[in-house]
A protein has these predicted regions:
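Carboxylate-rich, polar loop motifs that coordinate divalent cations or form catalytic acidic clusters
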Residues: 1-492
Length: 492
């Protein structure tokens, strides 16, 4: 009987990632792409699709046309009040507000300029019915859309005999507890509840010795807070503490949490130096996304200042020195080259050949980096320095201990997995081997059965790995080679 076999020189490869594992891709914008500064304080995607990025040195707008930077100019009253951007928000009317330590600016899109409306430092905001509120130091500025006027609310009233440290009452966060109550988080004086009907403040969560860094209410109405260096707190709707997660009593890898958001059923926690923690409340389990040196698919940086989910449900992260990046789920993970013997990448990023063992491990032939071994169970690579410099154009398994590899311009060798050394392999005899390996052809080894390897070069042979015999195969010369394929006719 006649068996027709097509051997493609380039074939589809199986993904290394396991079927159910989720990886993440990161699209980064930083100084190299035109950002004015790499420390990001605030991110906003407006209703027109423009991405606004507030840094410690300027405001940036990002569109399909590129990045445009806005700065403070002392001789221009319509420039930004300050280059240090604390906060960005868009109100219900589509107006863009920019909060800085030296005032609040409203962006005039038609004139492409700014009008400063409040000269005091602004740190936070919240949309309310008929307007928008801005948090300052012990003060909330309440802007009304209809009247275009602003009224002021104070958390604590100044007493004649007692001075208030206004900085301690800096309003870091404002979120809705319910339709009539707003939680107002201060820098050092705790979290207050503001009743919109009675217009009264009451202390909701007592103060902490450390600075408030984040305040977030989940869809199931749990309240989460973070104080710098104190881990993660969870409260119920009455302000009663439910849980306190730290490095010592949970899987949290860093107590310095800078921001909190909810995404795809998990809490995402940005940390100061340890990447992003993902927390699953239903299992009480933490997992991490971190930057790993040499792993180009890992988180770009480990110090994350903020997390922002836009109206398209894209998740963005701002960082201390790496600009911003968009985080998206993907079932494809990209592996690039790393320094020799770094297990997080390849010895050479150009891959010529692949062979998967029964145990799932993948042998990789590179273009000049020799042989690599990938273990999916650990997601790590092993480099073999003894093969470094070799261009490995095909790999097949000749036994449990040896691989048959074809090396560009060198011929076919057997590679011992334990000793990590080559030994020569001869196709039939020295004369035949020379013609097949050094007459301008590249011998390719392809395993088609447990005991059978096809060796394709000037001619084609079936090699039996058990009795070490060769059978010459007939080539179908009428086959169309336009698809880079070799067609063989072989009779058993």
């Amino acid at each position: 009987r006649t068996l027709i076999i097509i051997l493609f020189l380039w074939a589809d490869t199986k993904l290394f990632s396991s079927e159910h594992s989720v990886n993440y891709s990161f699209t980064q914008l930083s100084i190299e792409q035109g950002l004015s500064q790499a420390t990001v304080q605030s991110i906003l995607l407006d209703h027109k699709g423009t991405l606004w990025i507030g840094t410690q040195n300027g405001l940036n707008s990002y569109t399909q046309e590129g990045i445009k930077t806005y700065l403070h100019h002392s001789d221009d009253p319509h420039s930004l009040p300050s280059n240090y951007i604390n906060h960005l928000t868009e109100d219900s009317l589509g107006n863009l507000w920019i909060a800085t330590p030296k005032g609040l600016a409203l962006y005039d899109a038609e004139q492409d300029r700014f009008n400063t409306t409040i000269s005091q430092a602004i740190y936070s905001s919240i949309k309310v019915k008929g307007g928008i509120w801005f948090g300052s130091e012990n003060t909330i500025y309440c802007y009304d859309y209809h009247s275009k006027k602003t009224k002021i609310i104070h958390i604590k009233k100044q007493e004649k005999k007692k001075n208030i440290n206004m900085v301690d009452y800096r309003i870091q966060k404002m979120v809705y507890l319910d339709k009539n109550k707003i939680l107002v988080g201060t820098r050092r004086k705790g979290i207050y509840s503001y009743n919109c009907q009675t217009q009264q403040f009451s202390l909701f969560i007592p103060s902490s010795p450390n600075l408030l860094t984040s305040l977030y209410i989940t869809l199931d109405q749990h309240i989460y807070t973070s104080f710098y260096g104190s881990g993660l707190y969870c409260y119920d709707q009455t302000g009663k503490i439910q849980e306190h997660y730290t490095q010592t009593n949970s899987g949290l890898n860093n107590n310095y949490i800078l921001d909190i958001t909810e995404h795809n059923g998990k809490l995402w926690l940005s940390t100061d130096g340890s990447g992003i923690n993902q927390f699953a409340p239903h299992t009480q389990q933490f997992s991490q996304l971190q930057h790993i040196v040499g792993d180009y698919s890992s988180l770009p940086v480990n110090s994350i200042t903020l997390l922002y989910k836009d109206q398209e449900k894209n998740l963005w992260a701002g960082s201390v020195r790496g600009g911003i990046f968009c985080i998206k789920e993907t079932y494809i993970k990209t592996y690039k080259d790393a320094v020799l013997n770094n297990p997080n990448g390849l010895s050479e990023k150009s891959i010529i050949s692949l062979y998967e063992e029964k145990n799932g491990k993948v042998w990789i032939g590179t273009d000049g980096g020799g042989i690599n071994l990938y273990d999916p169970s650990t997601d790590k690579f092993t480099h073999f320095p003894s093969t470094y410099g070799d261009k490995v154009i095909s790999i097949a398994e000749i036994s449990e201990s040896e691989l048959m590899v074809s090396l560009y311009t060198k011929g076919i060798f057997l590679f011992n997995k334990k000793t990590q050394q080559y030994r020569p392999f001869t196709i039939i005899d020295k004369e035949t081997n020379y013609k097949e390996c050094f007459y301008g052809y590249l011998p390719l080894a392809n395993q088609v059965a447990n005991n059978k390897i096809y060796i394709i070069s000037r001619n084609a042979y079936a090699y039996n790995t058990h009795n070490h015999t060769f059978s010459k195969m007939q080539t179908d010369r009428h086959y169309d080679f336009s698809n880079n394929a070799l067609c063989l006719s072989y009779s058993n």
